[in-house]
Amino acid sequence: MNTLLTFVSINSENMKKKKNIAIVAHDNRKKDIIEWVNFNWQELIHHDLICTGTTGKMVEEALIEKCRENDEVPPTVTRLKSGPLGGDQQLGALIVEGSVDILIFFWDPMQPQPHDVDVKALLRITVLYNIPTASNRSTADFIVSSSLFHEKYDPILKDYTSYMKRDVDMN
């Protein structure tokens, strides 16, 4: 029996100067993420933003208000489904496709989530694809204030070719 296998390689695209930034927050952290967005709005408006559910609506509204007050053009905000409704998995798929450069995810460490397994899978994918990830304000501030944030960047990715080509014992 012949089996055709297609090996999918890890996307090795460079991060361009204009980044694709995913912004996600659990309900108890939405206030924190909006405070962070308001603090960093002048950086964020130069990038494309991807958000899950309600967070996306709140981020978009905050940036529209800041841009209106300062005569700036708001950024593109792509809104996915809410996390528990599949938004975290949509975001993970975008990472695998090479469409996300940075993840800012303020998750709630004190509250179990109905979609904890999806959150864990999303965080695993960020490690697998070497995506800079911030889970708190300090780390998020360090990411957007880094000189690398304002430049093209070539992330170093682990080569998983041997894993994809491994023999699996079917006995």
PLM feature spans:
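Ser/Thr/Gly-rich flexible loops in soluble cytosolic domains mediating phosphotransfer, phosphorylation
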Residues: 119-150
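Short internal beta-strands
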Residues: 46-59
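Mid-chain, well-packed structural core segment of small domains
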Residues: 85-124
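Short, positively charged and aromatic/hydrophobic N-terminal segments
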Residues: 3-11
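Short, glycine-/small-residue-rich phosphate/pyrophosphate-handling segment
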Residues: 138-170
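General beta-strand structural signal in soluble alpha/beta enzymes
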Residues: 50-52, 79-81, 105, 133-137
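Histidine-anchored nucleotide/phosphate-binding helix
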Residues: 31-44
